Each structure stands twice: as structure tokens, then as C-alpha cells.
Amino acid sequence: MLMALPYLLLDGINEDGFAISVLKLDGKPTRQTDASKKTVFTTVAMRMLLDRASTVKEATAMLDKYNMCMDRDTASYHFFMADATGDYAIVEYTGKDVNIKNPTNMETLWQNDTLRCVTNFYVSPTMLNTEFGGDSHHGRDRYNNLRAGLLKHNYNLTSSQALELLKVVAQGPEGSTSSTGYTQWSEVFNLTKRRLTMNILREWDKTFEFGIEQ
């Protein structure tokens, strides 16, 4: 079990200041089947990128060389990534009728201010008028609050301001059975200093700090 721990991740940062997070989407899971490519699963892909990529461009190019296979039958996922240069992107696997068909088209969404945050619905323009994209309410309130907070500070937040924004969108477990219905941890990444601060289960008075030696 200990040997598997490096692959049991939902976000992370590496020594080059590249960071990635994965968030749940509704609909069918991604199942790419290009015979010329090897297949990776969600967390294996994240481990690979944190181990091998230094920038967002390197990470997206690397992902494109593999089939993505997401193992849950009732959910898919999208990735948010950023690096120490200030570059950021969202990677989604899209397609028509994702409520009944497995999405297979990898889309990389770059350098657009509307794409500086994600929650639990597709943000790709190709998914705009779909049940799990533009018409979805899953995570919509959190997304709107994140957008408003980012705009308020012109997308330039201090670590303390970023944490205050995370407090605004944090959710309690009361009455929720969804894995996206309550906040298990909140993290602020400093990609230039290669540091992060973490609060678990909304215990804002208990902060854990981690750094990476270069």
C-alpha cells in the first residue's frame, strides 16, 4: 500500500513550480482507444506530469501522447494546471452526448481570463449548451464566487487573499453525500517559491506549510 501512495493524489506541485489539480465532472468517463498510444489513468497521469513536466506546455504535450482512461462509470474529470512562469490551462475530454457516450476529444483551453478557475462542470465552448457544461449547476455557485473574487483583485491575489477566497467557497459536510459536496482540504500554492499552505476540513486556525528544496 505504501508503494501506491505516490499515485493516490488529487493535486500537487513539483520542484519546478508546475502544479496540477483534478476535479470531478458529471457524465460518462473518458475512454480513449487510439491503438497507437499507451493508456494512463487519471492519477497515474498526474504522477507522470509532476515527475516529468516543468511547464504547462510540456504537460499538455505529454498528455496528448497517451490515451486517457477514467475508471469510474458515472463521472469524468478535468485538469487545471499552472506553472511558475504564470502560464495556466485547463484540459478537458469532450464529446457529444456525454451523458450516454464516453468523451474522447482532448481539448486544451489556454490563457483566457474566464478559465482561471474551474469547479465541476465543463468549461469548454464546445460543451456550452450541454447538460454537464453550460447548462450544469454542479459547482456553479462556487465558480461564480471564485470568478468574482479573482476579478475583485484583478487576478493578482496575495496568499492571504487567496485563502480568504477559498474560505468563501468552502462547503460543510452537513447533509451532503456527494464527494464534491464538502471541502476536505484547502490549499494555496506559491509556484515561484515552490511552497504550499494547507487547511484540512475548514479548520482555518490549523495551517500546515510545506516547501520543496530545489
Describe each region flagged by the PLM.
Residues 1-7, 11-51, 74-77, 82-214:
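C-terminal, well-structured catalytic/ligand-binding subdomain of enzymes
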